[in-house]
């Protein structure tokens, strides 16, 4: 029988007027176990798979919440929260705000409980997430701006309608639902040394870290944010809650300006470190998951893998679980991410070469590239650039290559043949 651990957080809420000004937040291990019981038959116990090729000096395992029902972990917290509502709260209907994954979790949970739901989403949310939320039964209200703007609109609608608000992360029952992942990790890999978790508002890492630290305090728990949305990173660095003026990341699922009050306190208490990863590092992680593990991850879902791949944490030689939190990525974004990842790994490049505008030049360039093992995928002549003489042109050429070394060999061979490389462009 699990030992019940009770933690109290007195939180002053600034903007959630529809909740009490001072809240007694109770997150218990028993509540997480109860959430696991409630979620049986609803949320999958997702696989933990070994991924030895992602980081050769670390024993990496992937917790595949991207294969969860609705495509992300969010259904755990949303379903458990809604299951615990009173009949009166259910009768008022449900309102939520989300960049996409919480929206789908709320929609599924509300529909299964026979409750009308409205979800406010930023108008820049991926189309796939918006459409999936509608298919799962929710009414979607698109709001111009970011997640925080969608949140503000949800507050307004809650005031107008009296609906029950389901917060995406700053709620003890939502946190308990997400914490069931921590229980599963310890069950699937008892001798785990560290767990790396994505952070947006902090609900996922709060639940996971609480569960893991309660059962095995020796396991390290690390959080990762996108460098373009480092709200929790900044807050933990300065030991007080901070709000970003703006966010800039394609990892829309963790593009949050302000972490939760509850979650910030829990991260401060239970998380060993928070780090950030760049957009290019996230793109490289997504590409690695596709190629090496045959897994599709969204940007937010890949940040833990990015942190491991690019040595952001002291995990060499350790058994480490990277939580792949979601796989709901828009195919257009995925295409751009793959292209960026190929460029980063030296397998795609664009060269611009200054040529004399006469027959045979393109053939000679192509032969040099072929001799070096490169593959030409696109060619464009630019005769209109005013920086060139009338008798010259720019040749913009796209290549498929093996790696950065081969790109250097091609450039050197072209230079040796007398061609002038103006620049290399992505």
What positions do the PLM features span?
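Intrinsic-disorder-associated, low-complexity terminal segments enriched in Asp/Asn/His/Tyr and depleted
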Residues: 4-7, 15-17, 21
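PLP-dependent amino-acid enzyme catalytic core
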Residues: 23-426
